[in-house]
């Protein structure tokens, strides 16, 4: 499996590793999917950011769809998304879950949804602008044009490039990446990155039902 990693602000380092091991609509899947790419954004109390980040993504020259996985945000995040769905009915989708079930399970839920709906390129991105949505086309190009199976938006290829995070969280993430690289021998600089693009075929090789998380992981 070919992994492309790049600093987005963040660079693309190339390495090759081997993988370890709804929505009701009156349209057919082929009718309403007009993009090959979907961005999964987990949310919990993101009312301050969610509309802005959706509009930025939809303002990009490359067309992306968005899937929001909302964990019952008490601040009304889901209500904002529902309002925007009226404006973007064929590009913006949401799965609402009851309770704060965790980031990891949100992505698993999103992966299953995206695979079911036949998107070719499936992205992970945070809602709080700690990932720059303007870099989504770079991730797409790394997979589509450069042949990567997975593209990682790295914060650590060229020093440390992190925004909207407290220092303690930055240090924890950085040294966690160092530890994972040391233990596994992976050549990916940012092993804890949450800004990625996967080819659908890669995720289809993984039994997502066997992946389990504890806490808000």
Question: What is each stretch, according to the model?
Answer:
Residues 63-73, 95-96, 125:
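Short beta-strand/loop segment that forms part of the nucleotide-sugar
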Residues 70-79, 129:
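A conserved acidic beta->alpha catalytic loop
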Residues 78-117:
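Conserved donor nucleotide-binding strand/loop of the catalytic core
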Residues 134-154:
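Conserved donor-nucleotide/metal-binding helix-loop-beta segment in metal-dependent transferases, i.e.
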Residues 46-59:
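Short, well-formed alpha-helical segments that are part of the catalytic scaffolds
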Residues 103-111, 130, 134, 163-217:
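Conserved catalytic loops of nucleotide-sugar-dependent glycosyltransferases that act on lipid-linked
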Residues 119-130:
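Short beta-strand-to-loop acidic/aromatic patch adjacent to the donor-nucleotide binding site
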Residues 36-38, 65:
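Cell-envelope/extracellular polymer assembly enzymes that use nucleotide-activated donors
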């Amino acid at each position: 499996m070919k992994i492309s990693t790049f600093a987005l602000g963040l660079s693309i380092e190339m390495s090759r590793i081997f993988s370890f091991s709804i929505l009701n609509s009156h349209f057919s899947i082929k009718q309403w999917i007009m993009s090959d790419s979907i961005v999964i954004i987990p949310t919990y109390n993101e009312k301050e950011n969610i509309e802005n980040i959706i509009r930025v993504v939809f303002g990009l020259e490359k067309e992306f769809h968005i899937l929001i996985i909302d964990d019952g945000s008490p601040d009304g995040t889901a209500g904002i998304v529902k309002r925007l769905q009226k404006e973007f009915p064929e590009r913006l989708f949401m799965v609402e879950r009851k309770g704060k079930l965790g980031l990891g399970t949100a992505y698993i839920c999103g992966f299953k949804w995206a695979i079911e709906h036949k998107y070719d390129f499936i992205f992970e991105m945070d809602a709080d602008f700690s990932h720059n949505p303007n870099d989504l086309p770079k991730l797409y190009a790394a997979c589509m044009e450069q042949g990567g199976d997975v593209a990682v938006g790295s914060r650590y290829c060229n020093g440390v490039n992190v925004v909207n995070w407290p220092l303690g969280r930055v240090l924890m993430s950085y040294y966690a990446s160092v530890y994972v690289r040391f233990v596994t021998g992976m050549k990916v600089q940012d092993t804890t990155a949450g800004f990625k693009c996967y080819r659908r075929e890669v995720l289809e090789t993984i039994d997502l039902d066997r992946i389990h998380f504890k806490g808000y992981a």
